[in-house]
Amino acid sequence: MTDILHPILVTGAHRSGTTWAGKMLAADSETAYISEPLNVLHRPGVFRAKVKHWYQYICNENEHEYLTAFHSLLDFDYYLLDEIRSIRSRRDFLRMGRDFMVFYNALMHGQRALLKDPFAVFSVPWFANKLNCKVVVTIRHPAAFASSLQRLNWNFDFNDLLDQPLLMRDHLEKYRGEMSAIRAEDVIGQAALLWKMIYGVVYKFKEMNPEWLVVRHEDLSHDPVNRYRDLYASLGLDFTPRVEKIIMNSSSSENPGELSPKQTHSIKMDSLASVKNWKKRLPEDEINRIRKMTEGIAELYYAGEDWK
């Protein structure tokens, strides 16, 4: 595999800009955008392996469960019969058509796979070493992350992490007590703890792999054209006028600064205005709580002024 055809992995915590980053990096015809193979609810036509947990951890010891499926995915081998058997709604049918065409076009045009998958974040070393992925990790301010989850009322069941012995052993054992103690209804507390764990692990990964690209969502939002141009250059992608236009349209001040909770995956927003939304949504006591809970990790990415 030549360097230019290495797959790209865009990951980071969910609700941290991975969709926007992935879509913008796949804005031209060089790449094929594939969404969340490690989502527990992934489509069987796209990825054949069963995913048991949110934030499934993959390493050398359990790779036999996933490696063949990922090789098929990166070969753009679409399992049409599996997908047909799983169709239960018109939405499923339309999604099958979309995914089939992504795989077909990738094969016909020799495209490079771009995997957008927040749930791969703990497994980044495996993706880099076994699948030769170029890595992009997005970060979003912890208060913005918590505010987004609270607004959507998306809680997180830490049993998905606690029930993974390899993940606990390798990265998260020191957080066992905090995960066990968090209340099921405490979305803010869950978000702060999850953010601290994810980006504490990411920081260790980055220290060992300085070539990986770790980007703040806020930096992309403040200067999208230039920041994405830099990412394109680092990944060996062509930053064409068409790409620039798509990025400008996705982040324009003419777009809304706030979206309906029903538009959870929209990528057209006023990017500059949207980074400030958490300051309007969260009361001061919740901001202070998030800051305290993420202390020790948040300072690695955000200065004190970023909390004001």
Give each language-model segment a name.
Residues T19-T31:
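A conserved segment at the C-terminal end of the G1
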Residues T11-G12, L115-P118, I139-R140, H217:
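Short His-Asn-centered micro-motif
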Residues G22, V40-R43, V121-V124, A143-S148, ...:
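Short catalytic/ligand-binding loop motif for oxyanion handling, primarily in non-cytosolic enzymes
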Residues K116-D117, K130-R151:
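Conserved phosphate-donor/acceptor-positioning beta-strand/loop module used by diverse small-molecule
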Residues M1-L9, H14, L152, N159, ...:
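PAPS-dependent sulfotransferases, especially Golgi type II membrane carbohydrate sulfotransferases
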Residues I34-L115, F158-A184, S271:
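PAPS-dependent sulfation machinery
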Residues I8, A32, K134-V137, L213-V215:
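Hydrophobic/aromatic beta-strand patches that form the interior of the parallel beta-sheet core
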